[in-house]
Amino acid sequence: MASKQIMFDENARKTLLTGVDKVANTVKITLGPKGRYVVLDKSTKPVVTNDGVTIAKEIELHDKFENMGAKLVKEVASRTQDNTGDGTTTATLLAQSMIREGLKNISAGANPIEVKKGIEFATEKVVEYLKNKSVEVKGKDKIIQVATVSANNDEEIGNLITDAMERVGYNGVITVEDSKTMETSLDVVEGMQFDRGFVSPYMALDTEKMNCEFEDPYILITDKKINSMKQIVPVLEKVASEGRSLLIIAEDVDGDAQAALILNIIRGSLRVCAVKAPGFGNERKEMLEDIAVLTGGQVISEEKGMKLEEFSDYMLGSARKVTVDNNKTIIVEGRGDKEKIEERVRIIEAQVNIAEADYRKTELKKRQAKLGGGVAVIKVGAATETELKEKKMRIDDALNATKAAVEEGVVTGGGVSLFRAAATLDSLSLGGDRQVGVKIVQRSIEDPVRQIAANAGREGAEVVATIRAESSERFGYNAKRDVFEDLFEAGVIDPTKVVRSGLQNAASIAGMVLTTEALVTDFDEEKDDRTAAIII
């Protein structure tokens, strides 16, 4: 059994902070319109980026205890990315500030549990403030502003995202792909997306993106569970003979069938991906019929007297392209009959009109949109591969942030909404060490303004003093233009959901670090340095 090393109390917390600092100090230099770039050493060629979560994910520290701190702050970035797709750098900065300020006070004798409670209470108050100040996003101009700011002030990207949303709706499917030219453009194609990914990650043919993309694939649709290779041998023989790829949509694919498919994928003898059917119960049956109509196939169901083993060619659907990752499947340009698709949309519309329950109406409208709507594709072009990757990251961030803005509205950007929220905490009087937690949040939420100023070459304290002297809640420092002005009027705005999520995730991780009393990790006599840890 391998030896373990244990670190306790203040030593443990200080070591965690060291790890947090190494990640946060690398990430926070990218904050704001004048944020700097970070070059990542990849196996093929360096990647230049200012995307916080991308940078954070690349950092692994030699010291195992410090790496624990690094992983915790990386979790802040990942959670924020998952929730909103943007705001990871701000979230990382807030977590670092709360942890550092908290550890100072705990070292001076403050009670960690009470400090944590104070942080949680203050965070709730700031979230309330943000929701009260949030402004609903209405009109094309406001959406362009959000998208442009989130794309590091790239107006071309802002306009493209807005156009895409207008074409397919704010809840429509928008994907980002490489362009075959140097131009960045928008294309809208018919398609359907549902929230089911591949049944096994071993089916991901692109291991970097963790997805599989098929051009002109066959699509097998069934409401049965596939657990034996015998069930699908006739289908696989046809697909293999034509050199085509295959998407399997079934209740499940497991057992011998899944193992055999994965083995053939690894060997390169088959290009196949299996996903679970979307929905549940009767809704699943209806959605499978939607997919069948869209792709020109048949739902192979024993209720219809059909069996997989008795497969015929006409049962297979097809599409121009299919993309599958861990969470979703997108079918683009199904080869189904246009008239049948239109008839299916009319049937669903009639069901919407007679449905009584709101839930049922909502689900039917979603199906109608997926069947009758389209997929907007932003095709990204650039002079070099490095520039292309960086541009795609910015577009992804801007796309997610814009959707978040439509969902919860926007607040003044440039770190000002959090900065102004600090004043609302002045009236809180919790007493004892809970008040210490409030002061920690109050101090930390001013840091984004300081960091944006520092990255723009200005003195943070000077910028903070200028903003504080002005009574208008929208007054702040526009780093892009290097002027002080009404940021909301200038179009410097942030999605409320992004700011809120980043703050809540930062407070959550900070609370965990501040209440940590021991760290335990493996100890390798040959590789690991000796520290203040106890080795057992």
Curated annotation (Swiss-Prot):
One GO CC term on file: cytoplasm
Keyword set for this entry? ATP-binding, Chaperone, Cytoplasm, Isomerase, Nucleotide-binding
One GO MF term on file is:
unfolded protein binding
Membrane-spanning residues where?
none
Q: Does the keyword Phosphoprotein apply?
A: no
Q: Which GO biological process entries does UniProt record here?
A: protein folding; protein refolding
Task: Give the top-rank taxon of the lineage listed in the UniProt record for this protein.
Answer: Archaea
Q: Which HAMAP family match?
A: CH60
* Its biological purpose: Together with its co-chaperonin GroES, plays an essential role in assisting protein folding. The GroEL-GroES system forms a nano-cage that allows encapsulation of the non-native substrate proteins and provides a physical environment optimized to promote and accelerate protein folding.
Similarity field: Belongs to the chaperonin (HSP60) family.
Oligomeric and partner information: Forms a cylinder of 14 subunits composed of two heptameric rings stacked back-to-back. Interacts with the co-chaperonin GroES.
Kindly provide the name given to this protein in its UniProt entry.
Answer: Chaperonin GroEL
